[in-house]
Structures are given as C-alpha cells and as structure tokens.
C-alpha cells in the first residue's frame, strides 16, 4: 500500500532541518518512509527551491524500538540535505539553558495539510501552559500537517518539536529539547558539519565547523570578503 504524508520542519543549520520522527517512521505501518522530500519556503504560488530529496534521516533508536505511546518523548528527527539551502532562508538556534518554560510565549510556524494540494505557511503564538521536562503543552492553533514544526522562543531558539494534538481539550504538545535529546542533536550536527566553500543559487559561502564565515577571511593565503549573510562579494 502506497501512502503519502505531509509534515513540517525547520532549519537549525544550513543543511539540517529538525522535525518529528513520526513523519518518517510510523508505528502503525512498522516501517520508515521509502523517500522523504522537503520543499523549502514553498507557497501556494511558487516553489522557490523545488522539491529536494533528503539525503539522510537521523532519529533516536528508542522511537522505533518502543511502543508508540512510550516512544512519544523521543519523537524528533533530523533531516540532512546534500546542499545548504538554509543559507538562503535563515536558521533557528538551539536552547542555551534547561530552565522550566511554563509561562513563556512560544511561536509555531508550519504547513497544515487541511488541503493536501495547497502549501500555505501559518504562524501562531501562545504561552506555554506546562513544562514537565519532557513535553511542553500549549494552546497554539495547529492542524494535521503541523507535526515537526519547531516551537521557538522570542530569541528564535528551538525549545521543542510539535508532535501531538488533543482536539477535545484544545491542548497541543511538543517534545521538549532537553538533556536527553540535545546530545543526540549535537552529535548529528557534528557528524554532518559543513566545511569549506559551498555554492548556493549562484553565490559562494565559506563554512568552518558548520558556521558561515563573514567579513574579511584569509583562506588558503587569499583574502575574501563575505557579507553579513556569508555571501562572497570579492572575486576569485
């Protein structure tokens, strides 16, 4: 049986997106998706970067090995792209502390699939109602298709990944980025760190350990000027 699904994801590095693991592995089917694609910054009128096949998907083994209920706290995944498309779109940061987030205002941006043929991005923000260390609960408006959307704070740092909705009680939930899953995230980022020159949509960028360089940079005994976005302005 061929089944096609949809979800949301956000860039946390120029070549890495974070999403929900259940967008890739489904317990009800007992298997991973054959293929997964991203359509960065898609809108109803255009696909700016086209349909890009994901190079690799990384997720915690507990999500697959546990039953669907117990696996919920491990429901996040990282999507690795061949090219750093995020350089053209911007990225979200990761949390710098593990404080309780009850009461803070968070934002969710994603693509609901109320109409499977329409790709329209929506954003909403509300306060976190509770934080038990594993899940964040809130009443941000979401629909099917939002799964995998990041929950981010006022500093544009990801604090959770939206995974659950309870329509009856109008409560939605996210897996919190915590001391259990952050080491996994950082290990994946290290393993897929960008290095050297990358050409993106006709512009050149230079990376060191995943970070775009800016300003004047001496590279292989030659000086180059990279603007605030990382784009090279000098010639070869």
List PLM regions with ranges:
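C-terminal cap/linker of serine protease catalytic domains
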Residues: 163-193
């Amino acid at each position: 049986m061929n089944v096609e699904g949809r979800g949301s994801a956000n860039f946390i590095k120029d070549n890495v997106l974070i999403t929900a693991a259940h967008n890739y592995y489904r317990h009800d089917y007992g298997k991973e998706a054959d293929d997964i694609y991203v359509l960065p910054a898609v809108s109803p009128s255009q696909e700016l970067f086209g349909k890009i096949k994901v190079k690799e998907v990384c997720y915690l083994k507990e999500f697959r090995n546990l039953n669907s209920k117990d696996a919920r706290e491990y429901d996040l995944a990282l999507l690795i792209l061949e090219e750093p498309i995020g350089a053209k779109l911007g990225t979200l940061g990761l949390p710098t502390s593990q404080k309780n987030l009850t009461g803070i205002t968070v934002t969710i941006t994603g693509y609901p699939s109320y109409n499977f043929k329409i790709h329209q991005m929506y954003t909403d923000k509300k306060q976190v109602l509770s934080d038990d260390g594993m899940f964040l609960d809130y009443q941000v408006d979401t629909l099917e298709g939002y799964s995998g959307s990041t929950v981010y704070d006022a500093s544009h740092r990801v604090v959770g990944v939206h995974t659950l909705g309870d329509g009856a009680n109008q409560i939605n939930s996210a897996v919190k980025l915590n001391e259990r899953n952050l080491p996994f995230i950082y290990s994946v980022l290290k393993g897929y760190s960008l290095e050297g020159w990358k050409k993106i949509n006709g512009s050149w960028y230079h990376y060191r350990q995943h970070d775009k360089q800016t300003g004047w940079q001496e590279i292989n005994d030659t000086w180059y000027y990279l603007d605030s976005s990382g784009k090279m302005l000098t010639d070869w």
